[in-house]
Swiss-Prot record:
Major subcellular site: membrane
Naturally occurring in which organism (per UniProt): Burkholderia multivorans (strain ATCC 17616 / 249)
Binding positions (ATP): Q87, G105, E106, G107, K108, T109, D515
GO cellular component: cell envelope Sec protein transport complex; cytosol; plasma membrane
The organism's taxonomic lineage, starting at the top: Bacteria, Pseudomonadati, Pseudomonadota, Betaproteobacteria, Burkholderiales
Cofactor field: Zn(2+)
Domain of life where this protein originates: Bacteria
Binding residues annotated for Zn(2+), in chain numbering: C916, C918, C927, H928
Protein name stated in the entry: Protein translocase subunit SecA
Chemical reaction(s) catalysed: ATP + H2O + cellular proteinSide 1 = ADP + phosphate + cellular proteinSide 2
Function: Part of the Sec protein translocase complex. Interacts with the SecYEG preprotein conducting channel. Has a central role in coupling the hydrolysis of ATP to the transfer of proteins into and across the cell membrane, serving both as a receptor for the preprotein-SecB complex and as an ATP-driven molecular motor driving the stepwise translocation of polypeptide chains across the membrane.
Cofactor binding description: May bind 1 zinc ion per subunit.
Keywords for the protein's UniProt record, in alphabetical order: ATP-binding, Cell inner membrane, Cell membrane, Cytoplasm, Membrane, Metal-binding, Nucleotide-binding, Protein transport, Translocase, Translocation, Transport, Zinc
Quaternary structure note: Monomer and homodimer. Part of the essential Sec protein translocation apparatus which comprises SecA, SecYEG and auxiliary proteins SecDF-YajC and YidC.
Family: Belongs to the SecA family.
Length: 932
């Protein structure tokens, strides 16, 4: 109450910011007359003047009014578009590293030119991030005319580009590209073997278009570069036979033994999209697997040797019960292609991780592709937080303002519209069944069609869009379907969607980024005519002129009919996605309307609010086909959406907290890697490693401060001879001197190792040997880092079970991840020293050949895939690996062992400094290694 009273007097934080920016707008407008008088060359010359002032120490903030005024004038001359005052405010919000929420049609693409131009003056590069290649190319080509006029270079960073093209794109003042490509380039840059092979510069300033889609919707899915791992194709095929033989349990058993309506073998948790075997399910699965010869008679699925089988059991169960064809994926050309649940687009080339994709392939009887090993990964949260300054723009950010601030430190500012909005948002209508809902939707569409009003119908899945299309065909209503299957025709369909009587069905936000203009998009239609080579030039000109002549009357006709009408056939779990659909209508002060039609069968209502609403309908004895249309019900649905949003926020935040652990380690490894690449000579590093490793070896047999009776000299001599190629007569030294100490023995061994090393260097020359050492070091770091990532994945999958032991899973994960990381660093020292000490080189040519082979083996990765894969939710079993973690007793062992398992999964000999396989968390030499 007090807050509301104060807001009335002082205005909200948003209003105060906008008011503050309006003062700067006045300063920009005051410069307009002066800037207008400049010639094109003088206007272009302003860029060089600004650059010199920035180089001399003037801040970009001080330069802002002049730079914005110059950019606006250049836009007026080149693009024939002058920035409105509210667009100048939007530009300022972006420059100050905030998120600008601007309604659809308010010109976000044009707004971005202001802060992009200003920040490009520093010469450190600006990245403009979009959601797909089409928008990146469209915006870059469209705005390049403006930037080039002002003397700035523009690059486009698209997937599949050649290495040289990428380097040129990043070297430009302004680089347009997709979020995925920027992230993958960062990962690839940290896998190169020469500094000249990198493409990115330091991350300076990024403007993220559709920031909610990139930083919120896609934040649960890390970018993963992976290569093929061991083949388990046969196992997926055999495991695919299991789910149909298991039955779902309805209801959950309570403490008093009640609650189960129908006993079964597994339970589904639709909210967290997880599946769990019941006790009877475990017994049945074990019996069936024993019959098929996959486990021994009477063996438990939780036995350590069956851990991987549990992984396959749960992957198959999730594939059959939680992932449905034409909703979560489609089958195209014999391949399973994921459907983005937020945009409805096909995500070709992306694969679910952890064996889930292979399980779905087995279910659909298509060719099963090999499982992948993670080579490098990063989340969008951690990638975008590396930019010195980050800003974003979208039509719908206010509902997620708290998350933007909490995770990224980005404040959201709602920018006023240029003209007052006229869209009418009608109350939701709720029906008992899906059939009644679709009948009402068809009635509404028919009414609009007869009145000449264009309609955009939003659906949440490809399946629903095709069902509605079928119903419209039966009703004799002509329409277009815009979903992932019609991706290529997307721009053409959207261009026509604002014409009178146009009916367009769109999956979620397919077509986002392209305005629906009332009366049709003349520019788009003209572009299609221009691109058609079969039409003669004079005919093209006539048709384009005809389009312009017709558009005015069509525009007025649609406005008179009420503008674009939006129909939502289902509420999404996020209010923001619903608002995005509504936002397609009423652009730039145009009329428009929207309404959602729901049924009690919809997942959101069924899971969160169905029983309550159904009880109201039953009490009111509502006849079939009658709808509830009441504010209390709409508020109830919005309350359910808020709960889901809060839960999804917690998941993303928890994911970030877990990934922050890996991120700290990633930074250390990448920093060390970069130092290695840039160093001319790493002799000091190699020497320090060798001394540390030799000390560990000697101390194992001749402990520090011990007496001669405790020494095992013959074993030390054998270890040095076999593992390090050092043939030393230590026993003779001991026999000759009764007063020799453990430290003197260590000094003697270290000196011998140094002499052997120097002899190898002398044979081939310092420069050649240093290059070889660098190759060995990089290859070892990369290989052990990959194995460490696999270890972290396995550790993460089982860590939630620590909660049952009254331990904090997050703290346990941090502790064990640190232990694994320390063990990995120790293993790097051991491995590098072993290779350098054991290498037998006779000539510089042999050395170069060995270095080339090492580099080739590491850098030439066959069958590399770039995934934006579903990441396991923190605190819940991971995708497809729910039970990898179920063996609490072996979780430590699996996590530790995986860090050092070879590519084929075989366990090598345990090193002294490796974590002990017993799971104690101690080093082997301080645990069971001491006993042996």
């Amino acid at each position: 109450m007090t807050t509301g009273f104060l807001q009335k007097i002082f205005g909200s934080r948003n209003q105060r910011l906008v008011k503050q920016y309006q003062k700067t707008v006045a300063a920009i407008n005051a410069l307009e007359t002066q800037i207008e008088k400049l010639t094109d060359d003088q206007l272009r010359g302003k860029t060089d003047e600004f650059r010199q002032r920035v180089a001399a120490g003037e801040s970009l903030d001080k330069l802002l009014p002049e730079a914005f005024a110059v950019c606006r004038e250049a836009s007026r001359r080149v693009l024939k578009m002058r920035h409105f005052d509210v667009q100048l405010i939007g530009g300022m919000v972006l420059h100050y590293g905030k998120i600008a929420e601007m309604r659809t049609g308010e010109g976000k693409t044009l707004v971005a030119t202001l802060p992009v131009y200003l920040n490009a003056l520093s010469g450190r590069g600006v990245h403009v991030v979009t959601v797909n290649d089409y928008l990146a190319q469209r915006d870059a080509e469209w705005m390049a005319r403006l930037y080039n006029f002002l003397g700035l270079s523009v690059g486009i960073n698209l997937s599949g580009m050649e290495h040289d093209q990428k380097q040129q794109a990043y070297a430009a003042d302004i680089t347009y590209g997709t979020n995925n490509e920027f992230g993958f380039d960062y990962l690839r840059d940290n896998m190169v073997y020469e500094t000249g092979a990198r493409v990115q510069r330091a991350l300076n300033f990024a403007v993220v278009d559709e920031v909610d889609s990139i930083l919120i919707d896609e934040a649960r899915t890390p970018l993963i570069i992976s290569g093929q791992a061991e083949d388990h194709t046969e196992l997926y095929v055999r495991m695919n036979a299991l789910p149909p033989l298991l039955e779902r349990q309805i209801g959950e058993e309570k403490a008093d033994g009640t609650g189960v309506e129908k006993p079964g073998d597994y339970t589904l948790d639709e909210k967290s999209r997880q599946v769990f075997l019941t006790e009877s399910g475990h017994e049945k699965a074990e019996r069936l697997l024993a019959e098929w010869g996959l486990i021994g008679e009477g063996e438990s699925l939780y036995a350590p040797q069956n851990i991987t089988l549990m992984h396959h059991v749960y992957a198959a169960l999730r594939a059959h019960t939680l992932f449905h064809k034409d909703q979560h994926y489609v089958v195209q050309n014999g391949e399973v292609v994921i459907v983005d649940e937020f945009t409805g687009r096909l995500m070709a080339g992306r694969r679910w991780s952890d064996g889930l994709h292979q399980a779905v392939e087995a279910k659909e009887h298509v060719k099963i592709q090999s499982e992948n090993q993670t080579l490098a990964s990063i989340t969008f949260q951690n990638y975008f937080r590396m930019y010195a300054k980050l800003a974003g723009m979208t039509g719908t950010a206010d509902t997620e303002a708290y998350e933007f601030n909490e995770i990224y430190g980005l404040e959201t500012v709602v920018i006023p519209t240029n003209r007052p909005p006229k869209r009418i948002d009608k109350q939701d209508q709720i029906y008992k069944t899906a059939k009644e809902r679709y009948d009402a939707v068809i009635r509404d569409i028919r009414d609009c069609y007869e009145r000449g009003q264009p309609v955009l119908v939003g659906t949440t899945s490809i399946e629903n869009s095709e069902l509605l299309s079928h119903l419209l065909k039966q009703a004799g209503l002509p329409h277009e379907v815009l979903n992932a299957k019609q991706h290529e025709r997307e721009a053409a369909i959207v261009a026509e969607a604002g014409r009178p009587r146009a009916i367009t069905i769109a999956t979620n936000m397919a077509g986002r980024g392209t305005d629906i203009v009332l009366g049709g998009n003349v520019e788009k239609q003209a572009a299609f005519i221009e691109a058609d080579e079969s039409i003669p030039a004079d005919e093209k000109a006539r048709r384009i002129q005809q389009l312009h002549d017709e558009w005015e009357s069509l525009h007025e006709q649609v406005k008179a009919a009420g503008g674009l009408h939006i129909i939502g056939t289902e509420r999404h779990e996020s209010r923001r996605i619903d608002n995005q659909l509504r936002g397609r209508a009423g652009r730039q002060g145009d009329p428009g309307s929207s309404r959602f039609y729901l049924s009690l069968d919809d997942p959101l209502l069924r899971i969160f609010a169905g029983d309550r609403v159904r009880a109201i309908m039953d009490r009111l004895k509502m006849p079939e086909g009658e709808a509830i249309e009441a504010g209390i019900v709409t508020r109830s649905i919005e309350s359910a959406q808020r709960k889901v949003e809060a839960r999804n926020f917690d998941i993303r935040k928890q994911l970030l907290e877990y990934d922050d652990v890996a991120n700290d380690q990633r930074k250390v490894i990448y920093q060390q890697r970069n130092e290695l690449l840039e160093a001319h000579d790493i002799t000091e590093t190699i020497t320090a490693m060798r001394h540390s490793v030799i000390a560990d070896v000697v101390r194992q047999f001749v402990p520090e401060g011990s007496i001669e009776e405790q020494w095992d000299v013959p074993e030390l001599e054998e270890a040095l001879r076999n593992d390090w190629q050092l043939d030393l007569a230590i026993q003779e030294m001991v026999n000759e001197s009764s007063s020799i100490t453990a430290d003197e023995i260590l000094d003697a061994v270290t000196t011998a190792a140094d002499e052997q090393y120097e002899a190898k260097v002398a044979l081939v020359g310092r420069e050649s040997f240093s290059a070889f050492e660098r190759s060995v070091m990089l290859q070892t770091v990369d290989r052990l880092w990959r194995e460490h990532l696999a270890a972290l994945d396995h550790l993460r999958q089982g860590i939630h079970l620590r909660g049952y032991a009254q331990k904090n899973p997050k703290q346990e994960y941090k502790r064990e991840a640190f232990e694994l990381f320390a063990a990995m660093l120790e293993a790097i020292k051991q491995e590098v020293t072993r290779i350098v000490m054991n290498v037998q080189i006779q000539s510089p040519e042999q050395l170069e050949e060995a270095a080339e082979q090492i580099e080739e083996r590491s850098s030439h990765l066959e069958n590399v895939e770039y995934q934006h894969a579903e990441f396991a939710e923190a605190g819940a079993p991971a995708a497809g690996g729910a039970a990898v973690a179920a063996a609490t007793a072996t979780a430590d062992m699996v996590g530790s062992a995986m860090a050092h398992s070879g590519p084929g999964g075989e366990m090598p000999k345990v090193g002294r400094n490796d974590p002990c396989p017993c799971g104690s968390g101690k080093k082997y030499k301080h645990c069971h290694g001491k006993l042996s």
